[in-house]
Amino acid sequence: MHLTQENNLNVDARLLNIENLSISTQDQPLLEGLNLHLQAGDTLAIVGESGSGKTISCLAMMGLLPEKLKTSGRIIIDSKNILEIDEKTQTHIRGCQIAMIFQEPSTALNPLHRVEKIVGENFILQGGSKAKAQQQVIQLLKDVGIANPEYILKRYPHELSGGQKQRVMIAAALVLQPKILIADEPTTALDVILQTQILELLKSLQSKYGMALILISHDLNLVRRYADKLIVLHKGQVVEQGQLQQIFKNPASIYTQQLLEHDLGFAEQRSTSHKILSVQQLNVKYPIRRGFFNRIQGYTNAVENVNFELAQGEALGIVGESGSGKSSLALALVRLIKSEGQINFLGQDINRLEQKALRKIRSDLQIVFQDPFGSLNPRMTVGQIVAEGLKVKAIADKEIKQQVESALIKVELAEGFQHRYPHELSGGQRQRVALARALVVQPKLLILDEPTSALDRTTQKAMIQLLRRLQQTEHLSYIFISHDLNVVKALCHKVMVLRHAKVVEYQPTEQLFNA
């Protein structure tokens, strides 16, 4: 059965009408006086930095706000006020009238369920048969651009790439053919090529199903090609609202002008220093296992014949699309995965070190992972997380406390943050905690895997300024993995471009960007 929708929609009918929506905690406003309306075919972009009220406004539209929050105003969908109806009616409206693609598919997709159940679950809950559900899921997977959907049906989320996970999320949201689709940061951690593919896909699906589309983003320049209406939020207040092209031509607020200014400049020049890392003929291969006994049938190359050098205080940017080998290279450098070739760090070949010597050298070589929410233990306070690396050393508790405080100060977090848990922090604050955890052991080289991908432009600028300052004061070297060329240009002295596991470009940053 092919999913279609009649195109004889009444263009004057409002699918969504929000009147003076305000949301607050007991003592703090989160959103103040939001007004908007949407018709079929409209694309609205809601843009702002972390904590501006973007996501919470859309959770309100979905009827998913925590009960402890105070709300006022009206959200009218299908002639009903979402803020006043009972849970049963809300459940019916969710999926049938309005659906949402959440920001991080890795956490939003149930790791214990196969794709077939994830996508088809709502269809079955609405009374559909399993046979029809499977047909619909296969068609939806085709519609969202997944090749070989019959094979993907049986896969678990961890077996999918980032782009595939995002497409599965979109399919799950579309299964009941909603009239309004909300996409919360749908391209945050994706490379530039995948970003374009996902946004083009959303627009084509909008046209096919006659939906209204709400794009939530921290990147004003990213949504320019895809939205016709724009709301800019700052600290819970609407600072700009209207037709997108008009706002781009003549932004009224200073805040919007700052968001539009996306050139972060070039990396600061450094004095020539001694070499601390030399990589020669580095290769990473993953086994391909098939058959009943899961035997190795061959190997796929993740990193192929990579060579480069890094000096003290120098920053190397590694860029490439998803699957190009960036993260595999980073994991190989700290020997978290097996590799072949020579990794000469501070005069020692990491691939030849015994475990005891490897543990010792890891204090000088630290990695900050892409998703701080996933890499920070939710049961530990910030102080405990940062102190973890010091526990293996013979250091007194008093000195550990002092070093933790010093590390937090370096990343511009106040002492009071020690007692908070990861879920109590913003995205930028969590990234600073992950950075402090690496800095507390006083490394000479930091490997940063997409550290700014989930951050808004303002927080990105602050993070880049912080990394620049740390590079000067701590004499750090960086290997900076990213898909954002503006960020790489701002921080790195050299750039390496990977494609299909191979180096296709390796030269000084200014030379590459001025070519």
Segments from the language model and where they lie:
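ABC ATPase "signature
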Residues: 238-242, 250, 506-507
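Conserved ABC ATPase signature
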Residues: 155-160, 164, 421-425, 429
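Conserved ABC ATPase "signature" region
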Residues: 132-151, 398-416
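A short, proline-enriched helix->beta-strand linker immediately N-terminal to the Walker B motif
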Residues: 175-179, 440-444
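Conserved ABC transporter NBD signature motif
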Residues: 70-81, 341-349
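A short, surface-exposed alpha-helical micro-motif characterized by mixed small hydrophobic
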Residues: 223-225, 488-490
